[in-house]
Each structure stands twice: as C-alpha cells, then as structure tokens.
UniProtKB/Swiss-Prot annotation:
SMART domains the UniProt entry points to: DSRM, RIBOc
Enzyme kind, highest EC tier: hydrolase
Listed name of the protein: Ribonuclease 3
Keywords: Cytoplasm, Endonuclease, Hydrolase, Magnesium, Metal-binding, mRNA processing, Nuclease, RNA-binding, rRNA processing, rRNA-binding, tRNA processing
Gene name of this polypeptide: rnc
Upper taxonomic lineage: Bacteria, Bacillati, Bacillota, Bacilli, Lactobacillales
Organism this protein belongs to: Streptococcus pyogenes serotype M5 (strain Manfredo)
Length: 230
C-alpha cells in the first residue's frame, strides 16, 4: 500500500485521507473470498459508485465540448470512452495493475492482465476517490488521465466491434445477424451477461460483459478475431 500511496502522490498529487477506502478499491472479490475469516472488503460496491460518477463526468465533458453533436453521437462516443477495454488501458497507464490484490487462483489464471478486472479496478478507484475527496477531485484526475486521449480524437477514430463485424459480414453477401442473451447472473450491482451472435441461424461466437451492450461488443470482438484466423 505504501508504494501505491507514493505513486498516487507523485504522479497525480492525490493523498487519501481514508486509506481503508483505497485498500478496498484495490481488493478483488477473489482475494476477499480467500480471506473471508478476516472480513476483508472487496471493491464491487466502489466499482458501482465509480461507474456512475464516471458516466456523469464524461457526459458533462462531452456536452460542453461538442455543442453540435447529437445525443446519439455523444452516447456512442461516451460508450467508447468508458468501455471495459478503454478503462483497462487507463488502469495500466496509471500502473494500477501492479497493486490490485487477487486471490491465488485468479493470479495464476492471469487475472492481473484481464480487462474485466482492470476496468472494474479503475471504476472502483474513482468511487473511492469520490468518497474521500469529492467529485472535483475525480474531475481533476480524469482531466489528467482520460481527457487528453479524448481530445486527441483517439476514441472518435475507433469503430465499435458490432459495426466492424456487420460491415465485414456484409461483404460476404446478405446476412441476418442476431444477438441473443444466453444467461444473466449475479446481483443487480454486479451483473454478468453472456451473449451469443447468431448469423443466418448458426452461432458464430459468444461474449461476456457487465451489461447486454458490453457483452454484445465482446461477442463481436471475439467473432472478428475468429474470422481473421480463417
């Protein structure tokens, strides 16, 4: 924790008052489950809070930055900014991946590299920062870490995976693409959806995500990866 505190202080000028919040933000459920007798808290509730404040701040930013963009355009751009893959990238940029506490099994299976875990970690950190320092501190942090990438136009140049898949398949002829929810698991604040892509009646790929939209994007990403190998 001491090294993490030093990182936050030197790189982002952030000093937590309540270090318990910071420690909880960097504790994965797998670690908490392995230390159940010690009553260790995990970061899912902070992730829920961080997701909400991230959506709000990015929405405010896009609304002010792009007065001529439509609601649909802003929604699409926001979804690219806050998607799991993007948030995992920001976690790595901040070196957060080096400090998350994982259970032994999750560590061995490569959890420290997994986008799902790192994206959730980034949101949990935002939730902890909100509770400890307030929303203006979260705004300052995002302005330092995320906003420069938005202003470079990095996210506007990225097509979503569903669009890319549709364009690819349409080059092969007429196709009917259907996204179907296979399962929905977990509590309301930590849902896990599984979605399959059915093309002309045959299952092409499957994907996972915290929402139906994210699961669809993951399934489309997996489909594109499969098709590139053919």
């Amino acid at each position: 924790m001491k090294q993490l505190e030093e990182l936050l202080s030197t790189s982002f000028d952030i000093q937590f008052n309540d270090l318990t919040l910071l420690e909880t933000a960097f504790t994965h459920t797998s670690y908490a489950n392995e230390h159940r007798l010690l009553n260790v808290s995990h970061n899912e509730r902070l992730e829920f809070l961080g997701d909400a404040v991230l959506q709000l701040i990015i929405s405010e930013y896009l609304f002010a930055k792009y007065p001529k963009k439509t609601e649909g355009d802003m929604s699409k751009l926001r979804s690219m900014i806050v998607r799991e893959e993007s948030l995992a990238g920001f976690s790595r940029f901040c070196s957060f991946d080096a400090y998350i506490k994982l259970g032994k099994g999750e560590e061995k299976s490569g959890g420290r590299r997994r986008d799902t875990i790192l994206g959730d970690l980034f949101e949990a950190f935002l939730g902890a920062l909100l509770l400890d320092k307030g929303i203006d501190a979260v705004r300052r942090f995002l302005k330092q870490v995320m906003i420069p990438q938005v202003e470079k136009g990095n996210f506007e140049r990225v097509k979503d995976y569903k669009t890319c898949l549709q364009e690819f398949l349409q080059t092969k002829g007429d196709v009917v693409i259907d996204y179907q929810v296979i399962s929905e698991k977990g509590p309301a604040h930590a849902k896990q959806f599984e979605v399959s892509i059915v093309v002309n009646g045959a299952v092409l790929s499957k994907g996972l995500g915290k929402s139906k939209k994210l699961a669809e994007q993951d399934a489309a990403k997996n489909a594109l990866a499969q098709l590139s190998e053919v």
